[in-house]
């Protein structure tokens, strides 16, 4: 397979106009048939009639040639016309299928949306990133509470069909895209298996929901008009979101969201194959859901959350709605799923699980063979053309009833690291790793810190321990075995690679009283300060922590915690009277209590450490 190197345009930041659209024009169809199919039959008939008129000898080559034309035009394979497969193959062979490494998302953006540029737009007093290309203009909103411990564990996200502004003669077409991206922590290490046993597979390592709002170019609409229309569309969408937490993304955050959704680490090239795309060290396959599931009245049977929990390294689900069609009675909608895995075997198993899940819901998906880069583009938060519009024929999304699209609402919030269970036997979790730096303080000793380290490894993290008591950590390190993502060293400056969603970084500081870290930190990097007890010297570091983990305290310690964390006197009493094995998770002046659950694997590691430490 020959590969062309990407040397084309990168993302522009100026005010230059976008070039003409590079996307294929929709093909005209009659009764579901392409015009090329009808022309092929006509050519075959003309060929046969001409051969008969010329003489019997001309029929010998004319008959197989005419038959080949008919078979090519009317033959079907794997649910598509052979002529469509031919067009897909020719387009696959004729385009660039490689994205070069880049320190930012510029090269990725240039490949996904040719001729695009990044600028900013002021919407309701907030400067947000705007992606402008030949299709139109787009802004991004991140949905969901991004706090380390959200106020609500679960909350529903509306379908883009319910958020789509009503059609109007004085507004350009609008398309919305809800992109869900999740890492299910499906590793094969002992730590990952232990954590799945603890959580029952209910919690994702991390998840992200991004809503893209796009206004499409229309005849007579100038750039300034599109900006005003986009501002109005975003205002209407935000009003419909109501109490759903959301924020507009600026330029840096938007580019980071784009790169993280693609899984492009910027250190290695991305290469498209026929059935899979190799990007960020993983293999990815995209699927277009062509027959949608029957809506289920029970939210527990919602399809989208179950898609996010497929046995893959990451899962991306894109649901688009719009523009309106048929006078506002239907709308174009597409559902695309992208799976990633470390090897082809695991990727095939994930694809089989996807098909089985959809079959149980009387739905069907088609793998985008020859269109894997189209699948990647469709699962980026750009609300651009989907695989149907980009592929052979350029047919665009299927027109569906708004109620059918609105039924695909999704519960959101089931991600994080599980610390234990509450009195209702429900998991208590918090987001140890986020797209921003996270600082934690744990009062209670090394054992709980080691449990957190094991569970962080299960989420894919690399753990760096800086300690003044190596004898407490070396038996733990030996118990994990060689090759474990753990390093134990003395306190001091250290250079570490930046964290990523799939490989976050946890720094554990077990060095007695320390000063609070006042640096801004980096995304996907969390710092856990471990203290055996709480004293006035810990006030600064505790007051600046995003989250505090408190085991039962002495009355004097509880008084310090209440003063620093802004807790009530009733909470102070609970902090000093809690039973052994309980842990309080403190965030934003609230305390959630959990029974510290441990697995057999974790108990084995901790017991070995305690025995060797005597």
Positions of PLM-derived features:
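N-terminal alpha-helical membrane-insertion module
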Residues: 1-104, 426, 546-549, 568, ...
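Conserved nucleotide-sensing/catalytic segment adjacent to the nucleotide-binding pocket
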Residues: 479-532
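Short, well-ordered alpha-helix to beta-strand connector turns
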Residues: 460, 503-505, 523-525, 542-547
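Extended, folded cores of ATP/NTP-driven motor/assembly subunits in large transport
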Residues: 2-19, 60-404, 448, 454, ...
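Substrate-engagement module of ASCE P-loop NTPases
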Residues: 162-166, 513-542, 554-555
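Extended, compositionally biased accessory segments flanking or bridging domains
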Residues: 127-131, 377-482, 588-614
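Conserved ATP-driven motor cores of ASCE-family P-loop NTPases powering translocation/secretion/packaging/pilus
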Residues: 477, 531-600
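Structural motif
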Residues: 145, 340-342, 442-446, 466-470, ...
